[in-house]
Amino acid sequence: MFDPNAPVEVVTLRDERASEGDAIGRVIVAAFAGEPQGGQFERRIVDTLRADGALSVSLVAERDGRLIGHVAFSPVSIGGEPSGSQRWYGLAPLAVLPDCQRRSIGAGLVRTGLDALRRLGARGCVLLGDPAYYARFGFAPSGDIVFPGVPPEYFLALSLDDSAPRPSGDVRYQDVFHPV
């Protein structure tokens, strides 16, 4: 039942600021704390993308002056073409503080990020993730765009420009995603 006297939670979604790298890193580490590297790999991805100028879209969720979520998008290469030349991007990582999850904050970051990609003239986006979660945004498994070594049902694609030809082949993310 709706309670008109319940407090309203205001969350602002916006571009990251140059001074927020450490705070974003803390959000990422907390969100991925249960992963094998405790979120340090995901944090290094974002820090390196930022340092390399390859962080095409980087959004934060803020509540009461505190960062509670983050999403990053960077150019990918498909079928051996130069990175970014096809205007396709990879979404990774998406992070929301554990105590703020299941409140549509991640969904808001994804939707806002996809809108930002469209404004950049992006043709599509790929990600490795849960098909049940990402289907709500239009992502689906794609047999023609593949990420080698990953079960195809978890590698998802979304065309953002249906007038452009859809590329096919193996996807390569920025080098930081592929540790040696």
Locations of regions flagged by a protein language model:
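Terminal substrate-recognition subdomain of acyl/acetyltransferases
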Residues: 1-9, 131, 135-180
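A short beta-loop-alpha structural element at the N-terminal edge
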Residues: 10-24
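Active-site rim helix/loop that mediates acceptor-substrate recognition in acyltransferases
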Residues: 25, 32-78
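Conserved GNAT-family N-acetyltransferase fold
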Residues: 59, 69-71, 89, 94, ...
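Conserved glycine-rich acetyl-CoA-binding loop
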Residues: 66, 97-108, 120, 136-137
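A conserved beta-turn-beta hairpin within the catalytic core of GNAT-like acetyltransferases
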Residues: 76-91, 101
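Conserved acetyl-CoA-binding loop-helix of GNAT-fold acetyltransferases
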Residues: 91, 96, 102-115, 127
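Conserved GNAT acetyl-CoA-binding A-motif
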Residues: 114-129, 142
